[in-house]
Amino acid sequence: MPKPALRRVMTATVAAVGTLALGLTDATAHAAPAQATPTLDYVALGDSYSAGSGVLPVDPANLLCLRSTANYPHVIADTTGARLTDVTCGAAQTADFTRAQYPGVAPQLDALGTGTDLVTLTIGGNDNSTFINAITACGTAGVLSGGKGSPCKDRHGTSFDDEIEANTYPALKEALLGVRARAPHARVAALGYPWITPATADPSCFLKLPLAAGDVPYLRAIQAHLNDAVRRAAEETGATYVDFSGVSDGHDACEAPGTRWIEPLLFGHSLVPVHPNALGERRMAEHTMDVLGLD
């Protein structure tokens, strides 16, 4: 190609590249700025199942609450990028939403406000010590009976269920109404409790969970009633109920480490027995995010 022609091609190429660069720069300068996704203002309420009591590491902010920084609220916040205020506290009852549970521990509802976007909670299991008493009574009866019969059911009958219906259920509803009043714009998720016992007795589990064979389904039915009370209270107050009855089946305290979400009463790997382990807290977070459509 003659030199004058070559120079013309090079000149045209440089001009074209320059025009393209100017065009991109101009387009970039006039493009609408990307809209950042708003950060969720997330408040976690609840008892030891929410706090992850027994799961390491422990939050040093308040050792009385035995709150883990690997609990399901932290997993949700880490996954979604939410701004977390975690006021969960081991042994909390619904009454602790409006009263100081310990000196220096404010009522849990004080953490809520009109700017709160998301609230999660697991609560009700400690109210009137009903469910704790059921586990303790049935465990003691199981040891004394050598695992035979249904001594706990025979002695207590419907008393635990009656207590849940008469006291726990209305207290749950009142607590959720309190959440709604303090955080009127928030999405509220009330979590059920993952299964502690299998559906039927497993003789190989007796040393870990010393329940008489006939009391295993009895205690599971009491837990099902507690979860149903949470469900009804949630539905009647506009909250979302997160049901664990299906996804936690086969992950109870009788299962092997790595499969179970709940640690057994005896010979477990957690500081707090009959509570979720680290795997359980992660699975609770994952299922809650699935139900709420969070990612």
UniProtKB/Swiss-Prot annotation:
Domain of life where this protein originates: Bacteria
Keywords: Disulfide bond, Hydrolase, Lipid degradation, Lipid metabolism, Secreted, Serine esterase, Signal
Keyword presence, Electron transport: no
Active site: 48, 275
Regulation: Strongly inhibited by Ag(+). The cations Ca(2+) and Mg(2+) do not significantly reduce the lipolytic activity of SCO7513, whereas high concentrations of Co(2+) and Cu(2+) partially inhibit it. Is not inhibited by DTT in vitro. Is resistant to PMSF inhibition, except in the presence of Ca(2+).
Species whose genome carries this gene: Streptomyces coelicolor (strain ATCC BAA-471 / A3(2) / M145)
EC numbers for this chain: 3.1.1.3
Subunit structure, interactors included: Monomer.
InterPro entries in the record: SEST-like (IPR037460), SGNH_hydro (IPR013830), SGNH_hydro_sf (IPR036514)
Temperature impact on function: Optimum temperature is 45-55 degrees Celsius. The activity drops quickly at temperatures below 30 degrees Celsius.
Signal peptide stretch: 1-31
An individual GO BP term: triglyceride catabolic process
Substrates-to-products reaction catalysed: a triacylglycerol + H2O = a diacylglycerol + a fatty acid + H(+)
pH behavior: Optimum pH is 8.5-9. Active from pH 8 to 10. Rapidly loses its activity when incubated at pH in the range between 6.5 and 11 for 24 hours.
Compartments in which it is found: Secreted
Protein name stated in the entry: Lipase 2
